[in-house]
């Protein structure tokens, strides 16, 4: 949903108290260290986690929106491709529920070692690519901008630091057509995949976080219009995270 003024007034104070708390962040980083959720353990051996952000691990509000729609909707019928592996939180939950091998993309090389460690320790079956998934063969490299927050590597939020990532054409991925679910947390690149979703005929289920800090009202309207055009209907949402299913 698009946050209106009333929503911001009600939600933002609670968000910063639980999800962005400096004092709790200190406790989590130096005393607890790892992130524990249900029977999962996640190591946080990553640079550039802002100290207040550690409180989201303490209160288990990390990736709350995405987690909710994944836990409510993923089943053993889903064979998932995850864009944005992060610390492995969403991939691990997805694998635990579906039981099916994952394809995971993570463009930030600094996260790969920690991500692999978490996926292995939580007994996931997966194929991990330190590349950028693209729809068109002609796309060779893509520029992504870096920030002081490991969560905010983006092609859309411009900073003075950037990396160029090798693109991987989707048709070069073995058994790609057998995967029916796309899960996207890509700091604005959800627009790219949704814009070109017509080329991914095998994708029947689409989960994504919509970044309102990047997209204006007209951009959001175009995204929703394109989903409708390609027979995707909304089935669930939690704040700015959505689940759409293709209905033919």
PLM segments and residue spans:
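Short, hinge-like loop/turn segments at secondary-structure boundaries
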Residues: 120-122, 144-150, 200-201, 224-226
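Glycine-rich adenosyl-binding loop in Rossmann-like folds that engage adenosine-containing cofactors
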Residues: 39-67, 135-174
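Conserved SAM-binding strand-loop segment of SAM-dependent methyltransferases
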Residues: 125-132
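Hydrophobic packing residues within well-ordered alpha-helices of enzyme cores
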Residues: 94, 115, 144, 193-197
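Short, well-ordered alpha-helical microsegments
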Residues: 91, 112, 138, 190-193
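S-adenosyl-L-methionine
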Residues: 1-124, 175, 219, 223, ...
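Conserved acidic residues
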Residues: 132-137, 185
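Conserved acidic-Pro-Pro-aromatic motif
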Residues: 98, 103-104, 171-248
């Amino acid at each position: 949903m698009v946050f209106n003024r009333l929503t911001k007034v009600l939600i933002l104070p609670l968000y910063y108290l639980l999800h962005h708390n400096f004092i709790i962040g200190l406790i989590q980083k130096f005393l607890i260290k790892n992130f524990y959720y249900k029977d999962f353990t996640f190591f946080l051996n990553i640079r550039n986690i802002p100290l207040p952000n550690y409180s989201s691990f303490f209160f288990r509000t990390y990736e709350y929106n995405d987690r909710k729609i994944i836990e409510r909707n993923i089943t053993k019928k889903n064979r998932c491709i995850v864009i944005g592996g992060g610390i492995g939180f969403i991939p691990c939950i997805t694998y635990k529920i579906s039981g099916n091998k994952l394809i995971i993309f993570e463009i930030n090389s600094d996260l790969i070692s920690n991500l692999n460690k978490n996926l292995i320790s939580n007994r996931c079956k997966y194929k991990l690519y330190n590349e950028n998934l693209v729809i068109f063969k002609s796309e060779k490299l893509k520029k992504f901008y870096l920030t002081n927050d490991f969560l905010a590597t983006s092609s859309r939020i411009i900073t003075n630091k950037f990396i160029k990532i090798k693109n991987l054409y989707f048709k070069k991925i073995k058994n790609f057509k057998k995967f029916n679910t796309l899960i996207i947390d890509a700091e604005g690149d959800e627009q790219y995949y949704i814009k070109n979703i017509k080329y991914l005929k095998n994708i029947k289920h689409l989960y994504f976080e919509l970044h309102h800090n990047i997209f204006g009202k007209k951009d959001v309207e175009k995204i929703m219009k394109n989903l409708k055009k390609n027979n995707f209907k909304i089935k669930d949402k939690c704040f700015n995270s959505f689940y759409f299913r293709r209905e033919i």
